[in-house]
Each structure stands twice: as structure tokens, then as C-alpha cells.
Amino acid sequence: MAVVAVLVRKPLEQVSGLLRRRFHRTAPAALQVTVREAINQGMDEELERDEKVFLLGEEVAQYDGAYKVSRGLWKKYGDKRIIDTPISEMGFAGIAVGAAMAGLRPICEFMTFNFSMQAIDQVINSAAKTYYMSGGLQSVPIVFRGPNGASAGVAAQHSQCFAAWYGHCPGLKVVSPWSSEDAKGLIKSAIRDNNPVVVLENELMYGVPFELPSEAQSKDFLIPIGKAKIERQGTHVTIVAHSRPVGHCLEAATVLSKEGIECEVINLRTIRPMDIETIEGSVMKTNHLVTVEGGWPQFGVGAEICARIMEGPAFNFLDAPAVRVTGADVPMPYAKILEDNSVPQVKDIIFAIKKTLNI
């Protein structure tokens, strides 16, 4: 009653201020979305938006996909747009390329990109080169997507990173998402693109939740292909990575920050075309460069970044040679302890950063 009496005696503006102080709304919890859910959401929105879009691959329909990325899509869109295929990558990739040439927009899922080797002729010779060979008359709007790179306990034939393989080929666009925001924005941009786009996902990231910004929750949200993102600002060293190693780089940056070393972490997002301008701008600021990737060292993504920096204006700003952190130059072992030592770890990134900083 005392509170009521006070309210009665005070002017309205003071009463409303008092109420705001006494009664406040709890801020809404951030929307947590896994990478798997983000890809699913992106495909769902594009399937709904454009009836020319369809998904095909092994077990993508009734089984909801080997990694459940296509969960619920078959029930929503039916057999004509969510299509289970035989175990023949050469066959269904060829069907998808032909459909793209005929004006549809197929999403061709490889259960793992290691199996895309069975369809390399369709991806490279048929999809990537047709626009050029037709003098720009025949576009091939197709998406090749699926898990890429090292997983857990699947050994040499199921653990390769194809970023450098496909990034080498003119006519392809190649993206490699890390977060849920990356995954949704890049898959939607890939589906809308009139060129063949390779989307290199990561099996170990599918179940990892990220906070999805409000703008990324929009059905109109797109991430431009060919544009990197600075995930963390820094002044002492530039670290460039894509896919799962981005998280390792951020962990390393957190550790080194306690020692007074501030790292700028760049999430590459797109392998081809590469956003070299963002990397150059960062290197000109930090004067040091470390690249991190899960693939093999020879002719890799890091090697290309280092070459481009050496050939461009940022080279004169380097105070030390660039350093690469890569997977080991061996086929992926099966034993866990050997597997762990074959892919970059946080400690390897920290060692490389201290090496280039000479500390």
C-alpha cells in the first residue's frame, strides 16, 4: 500500500520512470543455431523461394541425409524436389549438371567430398568449363555441397580437404563456412549464383551451435561470395583461416592476448575468388602473417595466400616471413593420437605466431 500511495502523489512521468526501475523485462535469449540447422534453414528458404531449386544425393530424402542436414525437407517438398539417388556420384552429378544446363538449380550433395572424386569429370569439365567454352551462352547454376576435410576416425580415404583442389580450377566458385552465420548466408548465395559453386562444409562443425545474429535470421540474408570477415581485431599479427581452423585461431588469439599479443583473425569464407584485399589491409597493419588450414602443405590455400602477399603491395610491410600452419604431409592415419597430430592444433598456431614474432 505504501508503494501505491507514493505512486498516487507523483506526476505521471515520475511514476512511469519508477515502474521501469521496479519492473523490467528480461532480454531475450540469443538464438543458438547449429551449423547443420543453418544449412538446412538456408536450403529450405531457397527451395520455398524458387521452384527451380531441388536437392539430390544419397539418402537425402526419407533418411534426412547422412548427417541430417536435409531433415524435414522431403516431407515438405516431396519426391520431385528432394531426390534419393543410387550410389553413383558420376551418375547423379551428371544428372545435376544436365538439369542446371536445362535451367534448373540443383543442389548436389556428396555424402563426403572424398566421393566427389568419382564425379571429377562432371564437376570440372562439365560444370566449371561450360560457361567459358560456350562463349558465355550456357550458364551452369549448380551447387556441389557436403562435408569436407578431416573428421574423426575415418582414415585416409575419407579425410581429405578439397579447398586447394577445387580452388585451383577456373570456372568454379568455392566457399568454406565456419559458423552458422557463414553456413546460412553462403549456401543461399551459392544457390542463387548462376555459376557452379562448391560448398565445403565440415562434419565436425555440423553439431556446433553459434549465436545467429538477427539479420541472419531473415529470409533475405546473403553473404557475398568472395568476401572475407575479420572475426577478431588485432595489431601484432594477421591469422588467416577457413572452416574449422577459424575456431582454433580464435582460441589461440585468446591465449596470446593474456601475454600481450593481439592477433587479427580473418575468416576467409571464400576460397575462390579469394578476398586478397582484406588480407593485404590486415597485413599492412600488423606486419606479420600466419595462415592456417587443415589440408596438406604443398600447393595449398596458405601457399596461395603467401604468394599473393609476396606479389602485392603488402609484401613491403612484412617484418618477418609469413608462416604456414597446415595438416601433415601424409595420408590421414586411423589411430586417434596420429590423427590428432596430423591436423593443426591450437598449440601449433601459437608456436607459429611466436615464431613469426620472434618471441
Swiss-Prot record:
Give the top-level enzyme category.
Answer: oxidoreductase
Q: Where is the transit peptide?
A: 1-30
Query: Which residue stretches, if any, does this entry annotate as coiled coil?
Result: none
Tell me which species this is from. Answer: Bos taurus
Marked site, Important for interaction with DLAT, at 319
* Keyword Oxidoreductase applies: yes
Q: Pfam families under this entry? A: Transket_pyr, Transketolase_C
Named cofactor requirement(s): thiamine diphosphate
User: Would you tell me the protein name for this molecule?
Assistant: Pyruvate dehydrogenase E1 component subunit beta, mitochondrial
